Every structure is written in C-alpha cells, then in structure tokens.
Swiss-Prot record:
This is Phosphoglycerate kinase. Pathway: Carbohydrate degradation; glycolysis; pyruvate from D-glyceraldehyde 3-phosphate: step 2/5. HAMAP family: Phosphoglyc_kinase. One of its GO terms (biological process) is glycolytic process. CDP binds at G212, D217, G236, G336, F341. ADP binds at G212, G236, F341. It is an enzyme of class 2 (transferase). Mg(2+) binds at A213, A216, D217, D373. It comes from Kluyveromyces lactis (strain ATCC 8585 / CBS 2359 / DSM 70799 / NBRC 1267 / NRRL Y-1140 / WM37) (Yeast). SUPFAM superfamilies: Phosphoglycerate kinase. Belongs to the phosphoglycerate kinase family. Signal peptide: none annotated.
Length: 416
C-alpha cells in the first residue's frame, strides 16, 4: 500500500456530478450543542473545493458517537447541519436517514450545487457490520450489508473519503462504494503525504518517540519502527519495564508490564542488529500517589524508586538527553507523552519534549505527532500550527506506524 500514489479530489472531474464525501463529523456534544466544531472546520477545504467546481450535489456522510446500530436521537447529526450551514454561509439540507426512498429522491432532484448531510450512518447496523447485544457481538445480515452499500453507492457518481480517523475501519461507508473513482479529500491526503514522508522516504536521522503505559500494547509499533528509525526514545510508563529488565532498576510501585517484560530482550537485540540507538530516561519525578497533589521528589535510576512511590514523569537529566536526541533528528514521529501531563507536577517532561520538537519543526525538520494523547498535548499548549503535522486519527495513525494497511486507504483508486 503506497501512501503517496492515491487519487486525490484534485484529480477528479466533479463538475455536474453527485459527489459523496465521507467526512468525520464525530463532534463532542452537550445535549444538542456542539462544544467543539474543529472536525467540521477541518472538512471545509474539501467541501468548498468541490463546490467551486460546480457539482450537481454534495452528499456528506458521517458517524457520531456509538449508537450501536440503532436510531438514537442523542446521536443525531442535525445540530451539525446547522453549524455547517453557518460555516459555509449556504443552506445545508439535512436528511433524516442515510438510505431509503426519501434520501434517494432528495439527492436525485437536487438543485445544482445543493449540499446534503445524511443522518448518522451508524443508526444502521449495516454500517459497522455488527452491534452489541447484552455484551455479545451480533453480526449484520450479509445481504442487508450488500443492499446498504448499494443504496449508498446509488447516491453518487464519485466518492471522496476525508475521514482519516476511521480509515482503519472496514465499514460500509469506508470500503463499500461500487464507483470507478474513489479519492482522498484534502485532510486525508495531507495525512497520507506526511506519513509517506516518514515511513516510505524519511530524511535521516529518523527518530521515533514513544510513550504510553504498556510495552505489550506497543509491541507491533516498536517492532515495525525498529526497521525504519535511527533512534528511539522510550518514555512514559513503559520505560519502567525496559529499565527493570535491562538494568534491574528499582521501580517501586511504577507500572510494570510482565507480559511486555518478556519481549524486551528481543526488541533490544533487534535494535542492536539494526543499529538503532534506544534512549531511556535516567532520572524520574516520582509521586507517593497517582494524583495532582502527590508529594514529589526527583530520583536517579541508580538510587531507584522507593516502595510506595511511582515514577510519573522523567527528570531533568532525561529531559536534556531527550532534547539532545531530538536536536540530531531530521524526521520525528511522536506517539505518546513521557509523563502524566494532566497533573501539573508531572507535566515538565512533556513540556520540555514539546519545546524540543517545536524547535525542530521550526528549523525546517519534519515532525509528525500521532493522534490521541500526544495530539491533546499539542492542543493543550497551543502549538498545533508550529508543528509540521498533528494527526487527526489516533487509531488510524497508530496502525500506519505499526505497518498495517488501512482498509479505507487501500480502497482508494491509485493515480494512473
């Protein structure tokens, strides 16, 4: 799966066509009020570009929340239609389902350039292909899924996916369109361009920074990156498992991942074989409880962490070593913060690392922040626009970094 060879919306002829755009309008709601319109704003460039090309109609589709394959008004996209209309300064026709006669008639009788927003795709079990009933997974009927996909396909002449956050899901609206031209929107295209830059053709030295609690959860990620990077910073909770196994450091009550511990020697062996430098913390900010009001102190790895205390951030010496490693790199991928940044006493390691990667990005290097917690960090400290690329998809970016194919990307047409 080459990330850089996929058709984009700019390669399509959309004039006079019905254009289906799978967007990610999974916005946070407080009742019917949208608390952050960021995801709607992010989709505007693709929508506005298509509008300028005078399409017959634009059909927008998204999921919202987890309605579990049934209609639940709490997860209706109706409030999104109003917000989108305000942002586009143009009426948006909200349809009360995503398939069916009313939807088909509305789209086929569209006024030129009309913008439709379909109701939540996940109100139908056929979108995800299953639902949970009493804790058990119940699969959708195969014929019903095929029909649902045919109904969605019948609303369009061309298909555009601009929802990177769900590109790792083989859902009907992501892989179910029987149309000849299937392209990436600007948002998805930017994601692919940056991940291709790092994973297919990085400017070296290439550094990956990993945080997170468990080695076992990140095993595929580490294993795949060891074939690609020149250096690897390991921070966060999983650093303690590495320190314990490799150096027999006293880690007190810090996170220890017994399953992950068995995998550490193999990973280190692979790093040596591939000439990858692994950088681990050498000192820690520790707390006597997992809380913002914990008592804190700084200890070195030689001193060890006493019983009853846990490591919740890296210490000043580690911050210097991490910053020096960042300063050497030309391509950086960061997935997972090095400390519990949500608590002020344990946020300094994350802040220092963020300063270092921002400086690197500003100096013209490529810095990619994977979605999830690390993207939250970039937003919290207001540096999103100072970093080459902050990914919009936690799960999808993780799977790309693990070396997996994303169904939604594989499904797109290749450039001729």
């Amino acid at each position: 799966m080459s990330l850089s060879s996929k058709l984009t919306v700019k390669d399509l002829d959309v004039t006079g066509k019905r254009v289906f755009i799978r967007v990610d309008f999974n916005v946070p709601l407080d009742g019917k009020k949208i608390t952050s319109n960021q995801r709607i704003v992010a989709a505007l460039p693709t929508i506005q570009y298509v509008l300028e090309k005078k399409p017959k109609a634009i059909v927008l589709a998204s999921h919202l929340g987890r309605p579990n394959g049934e209609v639940n008004d709490k997860y209706s996209l109706a409030p999104v239609a109003d917000e989108l209309s305000r942002l586009l300064q143009k009426p948006v026709t909200f349809l009360h389902d995503c398939v069916g006669e009313e939807v088909t008639n509305a789209v086929n009788n569209a006024k030129d350039g009309e913008v439709f927003l379909l109701e939540n795709l996940r109100f139908h079990i056929e979108e995800e292909g299953s639902r949970k009933v009493d804790g058990n997974k119940v699969k959708a009927d195969k014929a019903a899924v095929t029909k649902f996909r045919e109904q969605l396909s019948s609303l369009a002449d061309v298909y555009v996916n601009d929802a990177f956050g769900t590109a790792h899901r083989a859902h009907s609206s992501i892989v179910g369109f029987d149309l000849p031209n299937r392209a990436a929107g600007f948002l998805l295209s930017k994601e692919l361009q940056y991940f291709a830059k790092a994973l297919e053709n990085p400017t070296r030295p290439f550094l990956a920074i990993l945080g997170g609690a468990k080695v076992a959860d990140k095993i595929q990620l580490i294993d795949n990156l060891l074939d690609k990077v020149d250096s690897l910073i390991i921070g966060g909770g999983m650093a303690f498992t590495f320190k314990k196994v490799l150096e027999n450091t006293e880690i007190g009550d810090s996170i220890y991942d017994a399953a992950g511990a068995e995998l550490v020697p193999k990973l280190v062996e692979k790093a040596k074989k591939n000439n990858v430098k692994i950088v681990l913390p050498t000192d820690f900010v520790i707390g006597d409880k997992f809380s913002a009001d914990a008592n804190t102190k700084v200890v070195t790895d030689k001193e060890g962490i006493p019983s009853g205390w846990q490591g919740l951030d890296n210490g000043p010496e580690s911050r210097k070593a991490f910053a020096a490693t960042v300063a050497e790199a030309k391509t950086i991928v960061w997935n997972g913060p090095p400390g519990v940044f949500e608590f002020a006493p344990f946020a300094k390691g994350t802040e220092a690392l963020l300063d270092a990667v921002v400086a690197s990005s500003q100096a013209g290097n490529t810095v990619i922040i994977g979605g999830g917690d690390t993207a939250t960090v970039a937003k919290k400290y207001g540096v999103v626009d100072k970093i080459s690329h902050v990914s919009t998809g936690g799960g999808a970016s993780l799977e790309l970094l693990e070396g997996k194919e994303l169904p939604g990307v594989t499904f797109l047409s290749n450039k001729q």
